[in-house]
Every structure is written in structure tokens, then in C-alpha cells.
Amino acid sequence: MNKTLLILVCITIIGLTNSQGQQSAQFSQYMFNTLFYNPAYAGVEGVTTLTAFHRTQWAGYQPTLDNAGGINTQVVSLNAPILRLRSGFGLHIVNDNIGPLTNLEAQASFAYHLGVGDGKLSLGIRVGAFSQTVDYDQYRPVDPDDELLQGNGRISQLRPDFSAGVFYRARQYYIGVGFKHLIDSQFEFVGVDTLNNPLESHITVTGGLDYEPTYKVRLTPSFLVQSDLNSYSFDIGILGTYDDTMWGGVSFRQQEALVGMIGYSFFKEKSLKLGYAFDYTLIAQEAKAATSHEIMVTYSLPMSSANDKKIIRTPRFRQ
């Protein structure tokens, strides 16, 4: 299975040749937010978790006009196993503000789990709704008669959304492939073909290894690759965890930023986790701002009965 992991990573990175920006919310602590990228992750860890993220990108960014500011993103999610059915269920809501454009999505995921080899293979689907809102009052066209910007106020449109994925995890490694926005959805805010904004399909590949050099120390390298088949981006990083209680790490986002991460687990069962990520922008600081900040909180609910055996987590810090 390790060979399969390596081959899949190489094919994904080599086969995608153009690296540019793309349409997707961005998270530095991606290893704690797997459900967002892949519906097949629903219920895989065998415990019910509640997770919340808040991200402020390019903090302190000053726009040329008005008070649009930088990008800010919030996500809340529920991830729960359905042990008697060998399956899992997930819910998440994402709010992504990008200047005059706001993306809001609400999604429900279901995954079925199969024992394969020494691990678990999960197949998942996701259905939901994706909303885009354009605030025309924030646009300042060079040409006042530009037909693309003749709207007034805030205009919203809602479209159905569908995603699917596959996820495999064993005791010491995991890998998943998610396929997002599989329905061909178009947002047409002017009512004609002059301002089409399609919801583009994305492929996301995630993976990681769990290595314990000592009894209390765990090292977990991981990666995230995203593509719309025209462009791609990748994150690669490593976390070090001590005594299942505190962690720290670094990651690199291609042509974008260097990230530092810290976190701490509270209570006897380590059920409450608080994490923080700091991004330092590496390129084009004159057009952005130098830093971004991200906060993560996750809480694992107690097991409901003695028969609900917790599944071995891989890596164990993930939620």
C-alpha cells in the first residue's frame, strides 16, 4: 500500500502542469479539516467530533477604495460514525468572503466503510447547496458603462452541489482522493452570458504518514494537492506531537506562504483541541499583506456505550 501511495502522489503532481490560483476555500491546518476536502472521511475515526475554523487571510490588507479588506473564511462541521451500519455521516457549512464575492455552502456527507488489508477503505458521497453573492456596490469600474457591472446592491444565486470521494487509512498512513463540485453549475448574475461564473470541478488528494521515533513523540508528514484540471496547488508539511497533548509544525504552500502551527489538547481524554496557524506570505507582498492567521477548535464527544469501540486514528491527532 505504501507503493500505491507513492505512485498516486507522483502521478497527481507530475500530471498537472500549470500552477495558478483556483476556486476553493483555503486552510493552513488542512490535516484537521479532512471532511471539507473528502466526503469519504465521514466517520472514519470512529468518534463524533465538532470542529470550527476561522481564517483571516492577508491580515491588515488595505484596499485602494472602501473597506473591502482581505479574505476571511469560517467553517463549522460535524463528523460522526454510524458504527452499526459500518458507515459515517458528516455535515459542514462554509462561509468564504472574498471582497465583493461571498461563497456560502451547506453540505451533507455519507460514507460506507470496508475492511481492506490492514486498514479501512471508505467510499463517500456528498450533496448540498452552494450560494454565491455579488455585492455590486463594492465594484469600481474603469468604464461606468461596462455592461458586466450594471447590477445594484447584493444579488445571490443558489445551485445544487454534489461531490464524491474515496479514503483509505491504516495504522500508520492514510490517503484520500476527493472529487468536488461534480454538477455543472453556472452562476449568471447579470441575467445574460456576459458574467458567467461556473462552479468548477476539483480533485483533491490528501495523504500522510505516522512515525513514532519514541513512545511519546510522533512525527506526521502530510500533503494536500488540489486541481481543477487546468491548474493545481499543493501544501506539504510536518507536525510533531508530544504525549498526544501538544503539537507544532511547519508547512509550505506552493508559490504562496510558509506556515507555522501550534496546538494543545485539553482534558483527560484529550477531547478538546485548540490550534493556531500563522502564514507568512512569500511572494507579491506589495499586492497582499505579509501575514495570515487561522484558529481551529475541535471537540470529540464521549463514546455512547462500551460497545462503541474507538477506531485507531491515523494519524492520531486528526479529527
How would you describe each model-predicted region?
Residues 20-319:
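Subset of outer-membrane beta-barrel
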Residues 4-15:
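Sec-dependent N-terminal signal peptides
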Residues 1-6, 116:
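Positively charged n-region of N-terminal signal peptides that target proteins for export
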